[in-house]
Amino acid sequence: MAAAEPGARLVLYTRENCGLCDELMAELAPWLSARNLALDVRDVDADPVTRRRFGLKVPVLTVDGVLACYGHLDLAAVERLLDS
């Protein structure tokens, strides 16, 4: 696997009381730590535009603004985006 772009921006869109969001974050945390990557977590309900964009489709994980996965973690997709 190629090294991830140092400036890669990972954003996780979540909402309060979202079990899938909690599961995805728990799965993702050790992977991020092992790669020394930061995660920007945003509440979709805090912004009307973001709420309209994603609706009930949370959690949503993006890499540099590109959809990597939603609902469940797809590490292969995340790694492909980081390596591209």
Model segments located where?
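Conserved helix-turn-beta segment immediately C-terminal to the redox Cys motif
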Residues: 25-43
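Thioredoxin-like thiol-disulfide oxidoreductase module
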Residues: 38-57, 62, 66
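Non-catalytic, surface beta->alpha helical segment in thiol-disulfide oxidoreductase systems
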Residues: 63-84
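Small/polar loops that bind or transfer phosphate-bearing groups
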Residues: 13, 42, 70
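Local sequence-structure signature of Cys/Sec-based thiol-disulfide redox active-site neighborhoods
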Residues: 2-31
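Generic recognition of short, well-ordered alpha-helical segments
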Residues: 23-26, 53-56, 73
